[in-house]
């Protein structure tokens, strides 16, 4: 009898143990499910907070447009100060966000950068050739580059794009690039003396100095559209303040040697000097385009970015940055900067501007323990500032 009771007790204990184990598993699963639900809720709220930051940027840029000074963009503008470069916390009840607005024209546009400019960036010769091959329609690869033949031979084959980049992440698909090579400083690149490093001598990451969308309006400081040097008459140029003999020489050069492809070549016409070059730079362009892609804003670019321009020595770039506390309203004002003479202007004028129409809004939304980082590309057009695209970003700090 005792043995039977003992056996029953053992069975009961086994059943109880199984029930306790089952309840523990159920409780654990419930905790995991509840935690997952909380995380999903926080993810949604963090993204909404980040999107609120983008809307705040749109409102700020609308004020910038309404002020009517869009031909000039500076680091002293309200849009540039907003968010204190990501240091200020904006609270939305239980959630928050930090934000920074960056001038797209303060960075190097990898869709328009020339080979000479790329050679002054932290890139290997293989990366330069491969980048140019990826974005160009030509089917023949450069010496260290790659086209379809290379990409089709990979374990997971694909074709070369043969057109412009749509995101910086796309660089990872290009021969010679990895995620580390794009988003972290490179250590295996040989640099010339022209390269300016960071404040502590560090080599910049490609993503820190690059952009895929940048453009600026093609108007003078007075807001008037620039004349097309390839179609304007000498009289029209004279009406814009260009000396008659220079206007005549420009037309003669155009008629005998063909149209101008660079404004820098206009500055090389016989008779042009530092005094009369100002009227040319501020009033003429090589086409009738109202906007130009890829130019660098002298009012917002860093010394490092400016130094990537062929013809721009580091000391001149440093002098330009030193002038940024007083806005450059027109490119002709650069001639007053020490070291920036006519020769430098001839080499760089086609790649410089004083304003921008593209802004990058970097926002980190926070809800509980969850962060969501977004980057929005905003474009100013005839209707005002608009969102071109929004991307999820890997950064946790601005």
Predicted regions mapped to residue ranges:
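Compositionally biased linear targeting/interaction segments
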Residues: 2-398
